[in-house]
Regions:
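Compositionally biased terminal segments of proteins
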Residues: 1-193
Length: 193
């Protein structure tokens, strides 16, 4: 991840790669520790990472995946996968909205952009609706977020709060909004203490 945060200078100019960490790495930091071998990132205002910069830092392309890079050191391997692209200036797309409202967290000693927990939940609901095969896993991640942030259960992570965020921030309407809220209702809530 350091290559993304601190790329080498080229021709006297710093090559800045803006990105947001999502997926398992975000879950491990913000929700609950688990094991992940990959780092899912959303590139901001660019479609790809400079292949020469990645190679210079010791990364190789993952065979069969044009958007994934592998790094191996001291017997450990990690893959950096570009999960999506987003814009910092255009509101279109869920990852652009999540980035716009994101925050900064310390991940492996580096300050990186991450989605707010409410946006993580929304992104997981969108993923669950889009892919039935991964639905149970995505909804389990939503449940983990609810358990990790019980103080938000009556506000931003309530059914009304998530519905409002889907509608107002992500511009989800009609039947799609009803479907996503129905998925959210399926997620078990933590017991109130």
């Amino acid at each position: 991840m350091d290559v993304l945060c601190h790329p080498r200078e080229e021709y006297g100019r710093r090559r800045l790669v803006r990105f947001m960490v999502i997926g398992g790495t975000f879950r491990d930091v913000a929700v609950r520790p688990a094991s992940t071998r990959d780092i899912d990132v959303v590139l901001i205002d660019r479609k790809e990472i400079d292949p020469e910069a990645m190679a210079a830092e010791g990364f190789t392309r993952v065979a069969g995946s044009p958007h994934a890079w592998r790094y191996t050191s001291e017997g450990r391997t990690v893959d950096v996968e570009i999960a999506a692209v987003a814009s910092s200036s255009e509101p279109a797309g869920p990852f652009s909205a999540a980035f716009k409202h994101g925050e900064t967290r310390l991940v492996e000693g580096l300050r990186v952009s991450v989605p707010r927990i409410e946006d993580y939940v929304v992104l997981k609901l969108l993923a669950a609706a889009a892919n039935r095969r991964r639905r149970a896993r995505d909804l389990a991640d939503v449940q983990g977020a609810l358990e990790a942030f019980p103080e938000r259960a009556a506000t931003s992570l309530s059914i009304a709060g998530v519905r409002a965020r889907l509608r107002d921030v992500y511009a989800v309407q009609g039947q799609r909004l009803k479907t996503l809220v129905a998925l959210f209702r399926q997620v078990p809530r933590p017991a109130r203490g």
